[in-house]
Amino acid sequence: MSGRIVITGAGIISAIGVGKEETLRSLVARKSGVGRLRHLQTAHSDLPCGEVNMSDEELKNAIGVPADRIVPRTTLLGIIAVREAMEEAGVKGSDRAALISGTTVGGMDVTERCCLQGGDQSLFRLHDCGSCTDEIADFFGGFGLVTTISTACSSAANSIMLGADLIKSGRCDVIVAGGAECLTRYHLNGFNSLKILDSEPCRPFDATRNGLNLGEGAGFVVLESEEHALKRGAVPLGILD
């Protein structure tokens, strides 16, 4: 398919906001979401991180998931961002729609707890990165194609590029693409072993910079061909170029 690829919806949840409006207000106010960990239990709680300021229980309540259901935090973050993007775009799942999510650890927060505290061994299925994407897709239903990209820091960007290719090839009309990732002990232990985590809020443009801070969140966009978007009366937010 020739023509431009446009963005018709976007959603985000991060350490500085739930949704685009709150995130923008925080950015304008120069609010930092980096601080001490409050929800992830780890020996490295003194390391500053960009943690979403909601517990798993609060995230579940926000999307109507039963409190006693075991759901990876990555899944919960992803659902919130995907919901905002799809609602803004005015789209639903269909045979011609795809969900492409980028993640590195998937449901590792759940499997870490299983290893340390014991529990239902069947939950180790959530260790698979693709399990979170499947759960996000199941929450909304109707996607003709569901796939996961796991290429470390480039995962979400590669998800968007794959989505554009699927539209250009004519395989899909609508793509929901992006990424979701929660903080885990694996992240902190791994990066800390490399000696690259700053014990203070990072300052990348300072001559005395001393490392980075980790964070969590989710962000997704809805992609369509410009022709498809205009045909259904959608207003493009931007162009993917």
Language model features: what each stretch is:
Residues 1, 36-80, 96, 106-117, ...:
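Conserved catalytic cysteine-centered active-site region
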Residues 6, 96-101, 147-150, 172-180, ...:
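Beta-strand segments within the central parallel beta-sheet cores of soluble alpha/beta enzyme folds
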Residues 83-97, 139, 228-235:
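Phosphate/pyrophosphate-binding loops at sites that engage ATP/ADP/AMP, CoA/4′-phosphopantetheine
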Residues 77-89, 130-132, 224-226:
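Short, well-ordered amphipathic alpha-helical segments that serve as non-catalytic structural scaffolds
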Residues 11-13, 103-106, 151-155, 179-184:
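Acidic, glycine-rich active-site loops and adjacent beta-strand->loop/helix elements
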Residues 1-7, 93-94:
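Flexible, low-complexity linker/loop segments at domain and module junctions
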